[in-house]
Structures are given as C-alpha cells and as structure tokens.
Regions:
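Non-globular, low-confidence helical/coil segments that flank catalytic cores
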Residues: 2-257
Length: 257
C-alpha cells in the first residue's frame, strides 16, 4: 500500500485523528491498514493490506461497508479484521467494484462469515470463477446482487455513499468498475476500483462532483488510470495506492506517482 499527499489539505475539524500504518509488511501476514477516524464515534475508513488487490472497510455510526476484499487468499484476513479488530459481525453493505479476482476473490468469505444486508456489483452475471464463487455464497445466504446505476446513493449512518460510474458500456471489464464517492461532512473519499481512462473521461464530462479529500487511486497505480484531467477534478489531498510489494506489473507506475 502506498500513501501520497498532494497540495490541498483536508478539513482537520472533520479529520480529528489519522492513523497510518504504511509500507509493506513481511510474510508474517499482518494486515497493514490506514484508519481515518472523525469524531469519537463517527466515521472511519480502513484500508486493509491485501497485497496486489483492493480491500477497504468503512464504518460510520455503527454501520459497516466493505469495498472489495482482495484475492481469495485474503478472504480470511478481511474476516479477521472485521471480527477481531472492528468487532463487526454484521456488514450492512458490500460493494464488489468489478468481477476480477483481486477485488472480489475475498468477498465470499465475508458473505459467509458475516450477516450481509446488501451486495452491490456492476453485473449480476459473469462467467469467471471468482464471480461465480461470490454469487454462490450470496445465493446460499439468499442475498440478491443489486446492480446500481450512476447517480444512485444510500446512507451509511450520517455518511452518503454515491455511485458515480460506470456511465457507459465498455469492452474493458476494468471500466465497468463501480466508482463510489463517500461524503461525511466536509470530508470525501473517492474509490475508483480499476476504472481506466475511458471511464474517467466519462466521469469528468458528466458534471458530477468528483472532488475528494482522499483518492483511492485506480488500478493499483497503473498508468492506465489516474489521467491528468481526472486528477485535476478530484484534487485529492491524499492518495492511497493498494498494490503488492515487487508485483509483476510494476505497480505503481512512476508516471502516476
């Protein structure tokens, strides 16, 4: 996981405490995370170290949202973090940003271990083992997959969770990624999954507010994402890149950094 700060600073009246556990941890297997907490009981975002993948947990006013869960090998880590670190057994919302193994592979374990209220995905059918495994886990719990539309939103306590993308039909599965903006007071987080430039350009043309205090950088810091025009609209104070140490893809790419 990489952490980077850019020019604009957050509203520290909202961000009262920030814990950052950065750098890649060794093979001991501990979950490195960054927890952003506002107020004593209000809002926190946890970026779980799932290596070359994405996994985040958002908690607000006793409500819990999981955004991606890393690969299947990281499912137990996500569950352990939920149950042992956060003491959560009920997950109100799960978002699988897109049907790739490094994003949804660990979600079946979350669905099996926790009582999940709602599951979001950009598709409800997809011919690939990670998605089929997630769907079976959901079916076993009588949990329906909901395919949201851009512009729809839901409340997570006092936080608002809004879907901004996908806005079109794309050949590249990465561009199908559900892009989510979470706002709590004056603080905003933008989660982009693996959305690449075509999706980013559609978002910048949409007129929607893309600004964010914290950007979860798209596609693990690949140069296929985080275009200049997109970054100029988001203007984050901080950026989180989730990727594995010495990964085969060379993420994060130098030009993104």
């Amino acid at each position: 996981m990489k952490f980077k700060q850019h020019g604009k600073r957050p509203d520290w009246r909202a961000l009262l405490a920030v814990w950052l556990t950065l750098a890649f941890l060794t093979a001991a297997g501990f979950a490195a995370y960054s927890a952003w907490q506002t107020s004593r009981i209000g809002f926190a975002v946890h970026f779980v170290d799932v290596g070359q993948g994405d996994g985040a947990i958002v908690v607000c006013d006793g409500k819990t949202l999981v955004i991606d869960g890393g690969t299947a090998e990281n499912g137990a880590k996500m569950v352990e973090y939920l149950q042992n670190t956060l003491h959560v057994s009920r997950v109100d919302f799960v978002i699988g940003t897109h049907p790739h193994a490094d994003h949804i592979g660990g979600l079946p374990d979350v669905i099996r271990a926790c009582k999940v209220k709602k599951l979001y995905s950009p598709v409800d059918e997809f011919e690939a083992k990670p998605f089929e495994t997630m769907k079976r886990a959901a079916d076993d719990k009588k949990l329906k997959i909901t395919v949201p539309q851009a512009g729809q939103s839901f409340s997570l306590g006092r936080a608002k969770v809004e879907f901004l993308a996908p806005l079109g039909i794309y050949d590249n599965v990465n561009d199908l990624s559900l892009v989510v903006r979470i706002t709590y007071g004056q603080t905003a987080f933008l989660f982009t999954g693996d959305a690449e430039r075509p999706s980013e350009y559609d978002m910048t043309d949409s007129g929607e507010d893309l600004s964010a205090t914290v950007l979860k950088v798209g596609h693990h810091g690949s140069n296929t994402s985080t275009s200049y025009v997109f970054l100029r609209q988001v203007m984050p104070a901080y950026a989180i890149i989730s990727c594995g140490k010495d990964n085969a893809y060379g993420h994060p790419h130098e030009e993104v950094l």
